[in-house]
Amino acid sequence: AFIVTNSADVFILKANNVGTDMVGIYKTCTNISMLAATLLVALNTTVQPKITQLYTQQNYEEVRRIAVKSSKLIFWLSVPVFIILIGFSKYVMWLYGNEFLKGALCLSILTVGQVINTVCGPTAQLLNATGYHKQFRNISFFGALINIVLNLFLVPTYGIEGAAFANAISMIAWNVVCTFYI
């Protein structure tokens, strides 16, 4: 589902004859917006073994405490990145050249999705580490389906901004469902 979600937008952009220059700008925006999730990935890698161990020991309160603490830590460490990527998106894109300025709104939209991703914290790791991998798989497919459907409807009219919106909404939906499931 992750591969589908990360490939569908580019495939649908190309299928709708969005120019290769705009597809390149979109991919640059997705790569830059993922900077905001770098801390999430790093912390998740270190937290998952501890969560698995505590869950196996049925220490559910400690699992919850670590999940909440890591979510807060990830969010607050990521705030400066969010401020830069959203508040100064034109300047960030300008670093790649004047032709990339067209991607400033796209970058901001994608970064909003990453904000929610970090706020939700290690939800995927919690589901996988606690034996709910089938539920996580289903949630992932749900997110991929939302991504594809939104891309099909939004890209023809809104181009890369539509793809960014589809990406952000599917990421938000995926994270919110994971959070409520936990």
Q: Predicted regions: what is each one?
A:
Residues 27, 59-88, 104-107:
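Interfacial transmembrane-helix starts/ends
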Residues 29-59, 64-71, 124-129:
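Helix-loop junctions and terminal segments of transmembrane helices
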Residues 3, 31-34, 82, 114, ...:
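Residue-level recognition of pore/gate-forming positions within transmembrane alpha-helices
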Residues 89, 93, 104, 131-134, ...:
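Membrane-interface helix-loop junctions in multi-pass transport and translocation proteins
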Residues 3-12, 42-46, 70, 74, ...:
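Short helix-kink/termination motifs in transmembrane helices of multi-pass secondary transporters
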Residues 20-22, 68, 85-115:
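Interfacial segments at transmembrane-helix termini and the short loops linking adjacent helices
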Residues 111-142, 182:
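Membrane-interface junctions at transmembrane-helix termini in multi-pass inner-membrane proteins
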Residues 3-35, 53-54, 90-98, 157:
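Helix-terminus/linker motif at the lipid-water interface of multi-pass membrane proteins
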